[in-house]
Each structure stands twice: as structure tokens, then as C-alpha cells.
Regions:
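Conserved, carboxylate-rich catalytic/transport cores that coordinate ions
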Residues: 1-303
Length: 303
């Protein structure tokens, strides 16, 4: 489908292009309604026969991926909307919503102060416009060195998505109702949602009651653990990849700075490491928190 979307001929080309056109319309509508437009990259590892990292692949989202994503989002949204309108003898069907609250205003103000150090400003007074304003900023700086750092800080300023029985909507996707429905073989939340939907469509007798609150808390907690485990495993295999390359030179981009040094991410493989302040060559450097820069005492060189 990727090749057909990009203009080549193939089986079901008319159907695939129609699906792609609809997906792009759905995406444009979400963004117009205030959905966050975050570009992500995924690191994949190719292992040799001994289990060591042989090479890295950086996967970036293409139109074919976005096509699948939009229809998954549509299915999740429609299921949540459908069940939310149904009632049982208790007037409300217990359900697992995927919720993403509005960002905390204090965190947004900190983000605003942070980007001012790079010469950028966004309007933060209207909570309903914050996502649009951040999208516009990220679009303007897409090919600048500070893009990845500012996008990372924008994500950190947002609330964390969780599972709840009381729906508050999904801010990041600009949906009033949302759930996780499309992956019951790998997420317990989706399995619960399938059960509730099946019961709603048939008997309207539901096995879940107040215990669904505890289930939501548990799967939210386990999700955070899974994310942390994935992050640590990525770092582990990246370390295995570079451990035998000590002494080689790579192009990199500063991905973060702090009082004790700076973080640098290699451009070709996304491996990241920290350079202690005293080991930055060419000068004696200090951290300027007001300007969010590392500055050389003699040369005035900045990072």
C-alpha cells in the first residue's frame, strides 16, 4: 500500500487511494479541532545470531502508517461514543475510557518560558488554543536544530493519558469520547472493552461494576511500567551497538543540557549519551539557566 499511495500501480489501487484520501480528511479534521501533531521516530534493532545488536533502523511514520492509524483512531472513537450513549438498569454502562486531560496551566507557562530562551513565543491564555499554537510552533521550526528538544518539552508539559471509568475526553486527539479497542491480543484494556461492547450489543447484562475503577488504575500503572521497560531496553541495545565503537566519531545534535553537562544524540542512529561539563573540549564551560545555554568562559562558545 505504501508504493500505491506514493503513486505506483498495483492491486486494489483505487480502493487504497480512496482509503488514503478519507484518512487524510480525518486527520485534517482532528488537527483543525485541536489535536496535537507530534512526529515520532521508533528505533528498531537488527540482532545477529548471538543476540547482539547488528544494526539500527529508525522508523518514521509514512502515509501508509498514518492511514492505518486514522482508522484505528476512528474505530476507538466510535466504540467509545456508541457505548457512552447506551444505558442499563443503573443508567450508565461501566466502561473503560482512554482519557487525556487538558494540560496543567503552570506546566504550559514553564514551557512558554523555556521556548522564549530560543526566541519563540506562543499564546497560552486560551486553553482551547494551546494545542493549535504548539502545532504551529513545531511546524515553523521543523527543520531547526532545537526542534527535537522543544517537541520533547512540549510533550512533557502535557498531562499523561490514563484509563478511567469517568470520561473527560482526549485532549491530545481532540476527541470527546475515546477508548482502546483495536488491540485486544496485546492490551487488557481492549479486551475489557470488547467484552463490554459484546454485552451491550447482546444481553445488555454487564459483568463489570465498581471493580472496573480498580482495573483502570491497575492497567494504567502497568502501562507506565511497560513504557519504562521499553525505554530501558532501547537504551540497553543502543549501548550494545556503540560499545565497540569507542574512539570513532559521529555527527550528533545536542538534545538537552543541565548544570552537570549536555546530552548529545547521534544523528544516524539516535543513540544518546551525556558529556560531563568538565569533558566538553575547548574551554571551561558553565551552565546559564536564564539563557538555557552552556557557555565557554574564555571563547564565549555556546551550546
Amino acid at each position: 500500500s505504501k508504493e500505491i499511495i506514493e503513486g505506483k500501480e498495483g492491486d486494489f489501487q483505487d480502493e487504497i487511494r480512496s482509503l488514503d484520501s478519507i484518512a487524510k480528511t480525518l486527520r485534517q479534521k482532528r488537527l483543525k479541532n485541536g489535536a496535537m501533531n507530534i512526529e515520532s521516530e521508533e528505533v528498531r534493532f537488527v540482532l545477529d545470531e548471538t543476540g547482539h545488536t547488528d544494526s539500527l533502523i529508525i522508523k518514521r511514520s509514512k502515509d501508509a502508517h498514518k492511514l492505518v492509524e486514522e482508522y484505528m483512531l476512528l474505530a476507538n472513537r466510535l466504540v467509545a461514543t456508541f457505548v457512552s450513549k447506551k444505558k442499563d438498569k443503573h443508567n450508565r454502562i461501566p466502561f473503560v475510557y482512554r482519557c487525556h486531560d487538558k494540560p496543567d496551566q503552570a506546566k504550559i507557562e514553564l514551557f512558554s518560558l523555556f521556548i522564549k530562551k530560543f526566541g519563540y513565543e506562543i499564546e497560552t491564555n486560551d486553553p482551547n488554543r494551546i494545542s493549535n499554537n504548539i502545532n504551529a510552533l513545531l511546524g515553523d521550526i521543523r527543520y531547526k536544530n532545537e526542534y527535537s528538544l522543544i517537541q520533547s518539552m512540549a510533550i512533557r508539559s502535557m498531562a499523561k493519558a490514563v484509563y478511567e471509568t469517568d470520561n473527560v475526553g482526549h485532549y491530545g486527539l481532540a476527541f470527546d469520547f475515546y477508548t482502546h479497542f483495536t488491540s485486544p491480543i496485546r492490551r487488557y484494556a481492549d479486551l475489557v472493552v470488547h467484552r463490554v461492547l459484546q454485552e451491550t450489543l447482546t444481553s445488555n447484562k454487564h459483568r463489570y461494576g465498581d471493580e472496573l475503577n480498580d482495573i483502570c488504575k491497575r492497567i494504567s500503572r502497568m502501562e507506565r511500567k511497560a513504557v519504562e521497560a521499553e525505554r530501558e531496553s532501547t537504551k540497553f541495545f543502543q549501548t550494545l551497538f556503540v560499545v565497540d565503537k569507542i574512539g570513532e566519531e559521529f555527527d550528533g545534535t545536542v538534545s538537552g543540557i543541565a548544570e552537570f553537562g549536555m546530552f548529545v544524540k547521534m544523528d544516524e542512529n539516535q543513540c544518546e549519551g551525556m558529556i560531563p561539563m568538565q569533558e566538553i573540549p575547548g574551554d571551561r564551560f558553565r551552565f546559564d539557566s536564564d539563557k538555557f545555554q552552556i557557555i565557554g568562559s574564555k571563547t564565549g562558545k555556546t551550546y
